[in-house]
Amino acid sequence: MEYTVNQLSPVKTQVTVSVPAEEANAALASAVAMFRSRTDLKGFRKGKVPSSVVEQRFKKEIVSEATTDLINVHINEIMGELKLSPLSGLDVSEAALTKGEPLEYTFSFEHAPAFDLPEYKGQAVEEEDVVVSEADIESVIERVRKNLAEVKPLSDNRPAKDGEIVSVTFEAFEDGKAIPGVRAENFELTLGEGQALPAFEELVKTIASGNEGEGDVTFPADFINTELAGRTVTMKVAVHVIKERTLPPVDDELAKKAGNFENLDKMREAITMSYKKSREDLHRSSAQKKLLDSLLATLDFPLPPAVVEQQLGQMVEEFVGQLERRGKSLESTGKTLADIQGEMRPRAEELVKTQIFLSAVALKEELTVTPQEMDAFFYRLSTQAGQDVIMLKRYYEDNGLMIMVRDKLLCDKAADLIYANALVTKVAPVEKPAGEEAQD
């Protein structure tokens, strides 16, 4: 076997392979022998069927298997010599071995471009320090109270107030005609928590339980559904039920219900530790991304198109899945698939560029991923997804996704290595707008 390499672009290579007749004959003979050993035909003992009969009976299957096996052997050998790792699937030309004849075929693949790594160790970066205030702790306790609150329907037919839960059916109209996609039945929301447009909530608060009402609502100019952005519509609303939330007192009993804590002080200690740890992780992640962004800004190299498209496809699929889980469709956003792809493409390109950079760092640092680290990844994933870890791992194996997982873990290790060798300066935390901390 001989081959020639043609660099189609900085990120794509084509290999042309020439197979002499002798090698083709050997591959076919090996396939015939394998088929002969497992063939069971009436009139012959198993494994004793004449080769000529086997060739005649299974000619198509023999040629297919011999060709596939030989090409796979060649590709593994060639890729090892080229020291290139495909970032996308290999595109192999059609080929079929013929007895006594040479064979030529090609395969192409996308890979990382060649580039010089910047100095990634000893880089300066600022990381926000963590300060846990009393207000932070109180906001968490307030969320605990809301989660453990007693909720019951109101008996009197009055309009709802902030903090109360309403169940409504609504529909939007314009010039007397219903607007498609702007309708919901038995929609439940808590007033005063920003779960709906302020104008819509104000309208709901004018309608008593069991009654209907209508009013004009103007959608903001930056509304997610671009077809509704900036438009004023007539919203017809029916309020079915109003529920009152009674918060439990802040005492030792609350602590026991919240997490079987011994008393309120123990719960506050646990909240403080958990809050501090989550903020430390958040600030570290933010600083790490800032450091990576600064390193990536010094690099300029082409990206493999197929890899970008694959990343973009995954992101769009995840976005559409999130919409569907919320009972919405892509059409409900007022955007086309092309619109979403256009908005997400820069992020997809950024992710691919980051992956290529971190993979190069991992290679230079000779980082590896152990089987135990792979198992730990699937354990965490199964816990998050609520799925059996063995079945989840088998799915990844059956769908050829294990290399993707390994590469992700390698990139994570490379990012951690860069940050571990950075010159980190702690700075005072940036003050956030009121209420934003409570959302973390």
UniProtKB/Swiss-Prot annotation:
InterPro entries: PPIase_dom_sf, PPIase_FKBP_dom, Trig_fac, Trigger_fac_C, Trigger_fac_C_sf, Trigger_fac_ribosome-bd_bac, Trigger_fac_ribosome-bd_sf, Trigger_fact/SurA_dom_sf. It is found in: Cytoplasm. Belongs to the FKBP-type PPIase family. Tig subfamily. Its EC number is 5.2.1.8. Keywords: Cell cycle, Cell division, Chaperone, Cytoplasm, Isomerase, Rotamase. The keyword Cell cycle applies. Its main location: cytoplasm. The lineage of its organism: Bacteria, Pseudomonadati, Thermodesulfobacteriota, Desulfovibrionia, Desulfovibrionales. This is Trigger factor. Consists of 3 domains; the N-terminus binds the ribosome, the middle domain has PPIase activity, while the C-terminus has intrinsic chaperone activity on its own. It comes from Solidesulfovibrio magneticus (strain ATCC 700980 / DSM 13731 / RS-1) (Desulfovibrio magneticus). Pfam families: FKBP_C (PF00254), Trigger_C (PF05698), Trigger_N (PF05697). It comes from the Bacteria. It catalyses: [protein]-peptidylproline (omega=180) = [protein]-peptidylproline (omega=0). GO terms for biological process: cell division; protein folding; protein transport. GO terms for molecular function: peptidyl-prolyl cis-trans isomerase activity. Residues 163-248 form the PPIase FKBP-type domain. Transmembrane segments: none annotated.
